[in-house]
Amino acid sequence: EPKLGELRRTIAEAGFTVTSVAAIYAGESYADVETVRRTVGLLPPATRAERIADTKRCADFAKALGGAHVSSHIGYIPEDRSDPDYQGLVTALRDICDYLKPTGRNFNLETGQETAEALRTFIGDVDRPNLGVNFDPANMILYGTGDPIEALGTLAPWVRSVHCKDGNWPPGPGQLGQEQRLGDGQVGIERFLSKLIEIGYDGPLTVEREVPGEQQMTDFLYAGELLKKLKAKLGVS
C-alpha cells in the first residue's frame, strides 16, 4: 500500500492519467505464431484458472490507480465455436467482465491474433456490455489477419481504446511481421487516424513501441510529434 500511494503521487505529479492497465502473464512468449498459440493469454487450459485470478488482481490494481480499464491479449480464439477452448474462453471472459462490472469498467480485447469478423462473433457470444476492443492496427498486420483500416470499421461499435503502433506484414506463412517506428510501417497512420475520426472515436491515442533501451523513448517522442502533426492536418485537437 505505501508503494501504491507513492506510485499514485508520481503519476499525478507527472500529469498523467492511467486509462488502461494491461494484464500480462508469466510464461508467455511471442517468439513465433506457434509459440503464441501455446503460451499466450487465457487460451492454454493448464494456466487458464491461474491467469483469470491474475487478471482480477490486475483489475484491483487498475482500480487503485483511479479506475482504469483492463486490457489483454487473451490468445488465439479458436475458429470452431464448438471447440472446448472456445467455450472456455467465453466462460473466462464472462467471469472477468462480471468482476469488473460493479465498478463500471471494461475489459478490452487487444486485436491481432484473429480476424475482425471472428472477434466480433466472439464478443457476441460472450454477451457482456463491458467487453470491448483495444484496437492495435499494427497487430493486424504483424499477425497477417487483415487490413487494419477495414477491421477498424468492422469493430467500431466495440472500440474503447487504441494503440498507435506500426509494422510490416509477415515475410511468409507461420511467421510474424516486424514492428516499425510509427509512420515507418505499412499501417498507414494518417488513414488510421482518419478512420478513427470517421467512426467517432474520441478516446486516448496510446503509443506502443516494443524496442529495448533508449531507442524506445526516442521513438515515443517521435510518435508523439507525428501524431500532433497529423491531428493538426486532419483538423482535430
Language-model segments: what does each one mean?
Residues G5, A12, G66, R94, ...:
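Histidine-acidic metal/acid-base catalytic patches
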Residues E13, E28-G132:
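Active-site acidic/histidine proton-transfer and metal-coordination neighborhood
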Residues E1-G15, S20:
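Aromatic-lined substrate-binding rim segments of carbohydrate-active enzymes
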